[in-house]
């Protein structure tokens, strides 16, 4: 099975109205949703880390492709590292932001700011590869500890959590609603149940 021969990666782009890539992020995915309706959505990823070796050259062919086709706007590219030949295979290109796109904002690069600067203020920007180490997780740390199969990735995610560099876009400190807090507690409990019951 494809699932057993490598690792999944998320690559995000913002391409300007001048058809130039302004921002790239490249993150390794550690976990995905396990319920049938959520398959394909990641629940944990780590930016600035790659257990197969972090190399800026990985994204260069994708950058050239996006500019060659004259792409404009947001894009998310799903990739698979194939350990049989050491190459990254493109699975699909989504012409939008992803559910997990918040990790760019957490790393200091707000995608909407790029859009506004480009379309409203006509700002030209050099291409930036976001290297900031940041983890995005929708699941509690106990799920990360138990179900991330890659030891290097698991250790990196937990290290970032300890350093305060793991974010959950569903959690907002200023939202002190008891109803909201209960919802998030139940969501964590449900994630624990799902990962225990369902196989990926």
Predicted regions and their residues:
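ATP-dependent carboxylate/phosphate-activation module, predominantly the ATP-grasp catalytic core
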Residues: 1-70, 94-119
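Peripheral (often C-terminal) accessory segments that flank ATP-dependent C-N-forming ligase machineries
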Residues: 117-200
């Amino acid at each position: 099975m494809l699932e057993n021969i490598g690792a999944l990666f998320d690559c995000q782009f913002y391409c300007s109205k001048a058809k130039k890539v302004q921002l790239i992020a490249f993150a390794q995915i550690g976990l995905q949703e396990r319920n049938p309706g959520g398959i394909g959505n990641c629940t944990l990823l780590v930016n600035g880390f790659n257990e197969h070796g972090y190399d800026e050259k990985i994204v260069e062919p994708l950058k050239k492709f996006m500019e060659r086709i004259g792409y404009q706007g947001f894009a998310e590219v799903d990739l698979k590292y194939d350990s049989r030949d050491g190459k990254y295979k493109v699975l699909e290109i989504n012409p939008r932001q992803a559910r997990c796109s918040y990790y760019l904002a957490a790393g200091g690069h707000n995608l909407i700011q790029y859009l506004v600067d480009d379309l409203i203020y006509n700002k030209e920007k050099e291409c930036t590869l976001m290297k900031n180490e940041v983890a995005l997780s929708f699941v509690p740390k106990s799920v990360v500890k138990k179900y991330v199969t890659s030891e290097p990735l698991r250790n990196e995610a937990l290290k970032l959590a300890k350093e305060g560099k793991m974010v959950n876009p569903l959690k907002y400190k200023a939202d002190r609603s008891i109803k909201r807090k209960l919802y998030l507690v139940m969501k964590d409990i449900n994630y624990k149940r799902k990962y225990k019951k369902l196989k990926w």
